[in-house]
Amino acid sequence: MPSFDVVSKTDLAEVDNALAGITREVAQRFDFKGSKCSVERKDQMITVLADDDSKLKTMHELLSVHFTRRKVDPKALDYKTVEKASGNTVRQEVRIKDGVETVLAKRLVKEIKDAKLKVQVAIQGDELRVTGKKRDDLQEAIALLRKLDVDQPLQYINFRD
């Protein structure tokens, strides 16, 4: 029986490459001269440190640009609240989303069921398994999922006939 998996994975090596590019750009840009702006990653968290809110906003733009350049979807970033750090600096934690969360998984299952496609959907941990009798039904399911406005990048893997 044909099937495929819906996952949300982020390539951490590409994230590291993007962060290295941001660090290089911050070191060379004129508007960051003498500032204490930095980005660093620890596991699934990125810490952004900036002098003030305007520099933090610029760092967000740099994150978006460099992630897109490295073919990492910026939707994979979950920005936490901005907090004061030592001195006059501000810090923000950014979580890298990995895996399809249960709330999103239930929403995707509901959307597929509402479309009345001839497929079965099963939630397996942090991924979805979609099975059907015909390959065409699975391709319709992929097209439906791509049309949905999801706040997280989705990949479709293990397409088996």
Swiss-Prot record:
UniProt keyword list: Nucleotide-binding
The UniProt record lists the keyword Nucleotide-binding: yes
GO terms for cellular component: cytosol
Keyword Lipid biosynthesis: no
Signal sequence residues: none
GO MF annotation: an example: nucleotide binding
Cited InterPro entries: DUF520, UPF0234-like_C, UPF0234_N, YajQ-like_sf
Pfam families documented for this protein: DUF520
Residue runs in coiled coils: none
HAMAP family: YajQ
UniProt family annotation: Belongs to the YajQ family.
Role this protein plays: Nucleotide-binding protein.
PANTHER family for the chain: UPF0234 PROTEIN YAJQ
Official protein name in the record: Nucleotide-binding protein amb3630
